[in-house]
A protein has these predicted regions:
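Intrinsically disordered, low-complexity terminal regions
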Residues: 1-206
Length: 206
């Protein structure tokens, strides 16, 4: 995976045609991610100033001519606006690679509850109760931006702002319920989070 050209200030996703063309994406709302055989990125969003608040919906099927071991590759970049992304997945075999370059912006990521793979981040990270309860046990944090194996999920986040990791529930197809997950955490109804070597704060939500 080559590093995206961060000097590009637009919001675009490469089309599947053989022509060198793109179509604009809305920076808010839902977007269905689809296999793009002629691009390094299956979804590419880069905007200098505007806030980004998107639900990226991963496919529940393999597209025609899509390699069996292909990970959906997504890039989101901004220079100043806050970033909020929900990675929505209903089929756990649809693995993904997500890279977020956010300069000084705060980033909120909702990762699917069946996430399994690695996370590399530059910036102070916080974790919601839902993330700790349902996701943390299947995550290992790395000091490098190695993309890892195609058979696992991978997230890379670089920002000088704050990163908030939250959980998107694959069973309810909705973001975590903060009150419910906080009660689970308080009364010990969830598995203990593994120790990590990173500096993180536990977020108690009311």
């Amino acid at each position: 995976m080559s590093t995206a050209d961060h000097s590009t200030i637009n919001s675009a996703c490469t089309s599947t045609s053989g022509k060198d063309q793109s179509y604009l994406l809305k920076l808010c709302g839902s977007h269905k991610v689809s296999y793009q055989p002629n691009s390094d990125w299956d979804c590419y969003v880069d905007d200098a100033q505007k806030p980004i608040d998107m639900d990226l919906i991963l496919p529940h099927y393999r597209a025609r001519y899509q390699p069996i071991n292909h990970r959906m590759n997504m890039f989101v970049g901004t220079e100043a606006g806050p970033v909020k992304l929900k990675i929505c997945r209903s089929f756990s075999r649809s693995k993904f690679y997500l890279e977020v370059q956010a300069s000084m912006s705060d980033v909120t990521l909702y990762l699917p509850s069946d996430f399994k793979g690695r996370i590399h981040h530059v910036g102070k990270a916080k974790f919601s109760s839902g993330f700790v309860n349902r996701v943390m046990q299947n995550v290992y944090f790395t000091d490098s931006d190695d993309e890892g194996s195609e058979s696992e999920d991978c997230v890379v986040v670089v920002t000088n702002g704050t990163i908030m990791f939250r959980m998107w529930d694959v069973q309810t197809c909705a973001p975590e319920n903060p009150q419910k997950e906080t009660f689970k955490r308080m009364f010990g109804c969830s598995k203990k989070a593994p120790e990590t070597t990173i500096d993180w704060d536990f977020l108690l939500e009311g």
